[in-house]
Amino acid sequence: MLKGLTLALGMSLLMVGCSSGSPAPEGNQPAPQNGETAQGGVGQQVDYKIVGIDPGAGLMKATEKAIQEYELKDWELVEGSSAAMTAALTQAYKDQKPIIVTGWTPHWMFSKFDLKYLEDPKGVYGKDEQIHTIVRKGLKEEQPSAYAFLDKFHWSPADMEKVMLAITDGQKPEEAAAAWVKENEALVNEWVAGIEPAEGQKLTLAYVAWDSEIASTNVVKEVLEQKLKYKVELSQVEAGPMWIGVSNGDVDGMVAAWLPTTHEDYYQKLGDKIEDLGPNLEGTKLGLAVPAYMDINSIEDLKK
């Protein structure tokens, strides 16, 4: 969707961007009144560990670079998954303990917890990212209705976070997507205005198991099936297979490309084999996040 130029981090990171496997606490959580209870500097308090996500993600690469750029020689970036990261954050917040995690926006954890990004004076994490819609070559000619809708699909971080929160709070992804579509009929009708229904044609969309992409992909599936009468199959894969699947035509498209940072490597390698329809969401952010009750404001503070 070349509406403008992203996965953001480099987000492609994605990211970001995020498994939905970890439970979130009930309701909005106020920041604890007691700050850091451990003794010593922030490094000692968190055992010189930054809790990361999936190895190889753009956000992880950016964080490895940050450790080098800020000369955090004693620090370790812990690999895992977005689900493991949010589980660790949830427990630390509940216990009012210090913790440093790799973070990105949009993400439900910023709505559930009072968090803040650490300032990045060296600009290691780059500027805000965008999430792009990517489709296979030939989709416009073979599936014009799907192409037209995917080209028009565009929403806000606030829209996405509503669906993410509903899923995190226990709704099935398809139920949360259907509820959002019903509540936002006017916007959805703008997306499909003037597009002919496909009446049972099949379409395959790929996505990564990040909270953000689970939300967006299920909303797109709901609109394609409810409004345009497609039969949509979703394929959950890792970032690499997602990009490769679209580039070789095994998958029709995705709405999960974090650019220009998170998925930068994939875009550079496969950009001439796919069609970029441009951003479907702007305003994403990557960086290191901490609970607001921690007395720390910048990545440079980690050296103290």
Go through each PLM region and give its residues.
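Bacterial signal peptide processing site
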Residues: 19-22
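Immediate post-signal peptide segment of exported/extracytoplasmic ligand-binding proteins
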Residues: 24-47, 182-205, 301-304
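A conserved helix-loop-strand patch within extracytoplasmic ligand-binding domains
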Residues: 31-51, 136-138, 148, 154-157, ...
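Short, well-ordered beta-strand elements
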Residues: 40, 44-52, 150, 199-212, ...
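Short helix-initiation/N-cap motifs at beta->coil->alpha
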Residues: 77-88, 210-211, 231-245
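Pocket-flanking alpha-helical
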Residues: 86-93, 107-116, 217, 239-271
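Periplasmic-binding protein-like
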Residues: 110-151, 278-287
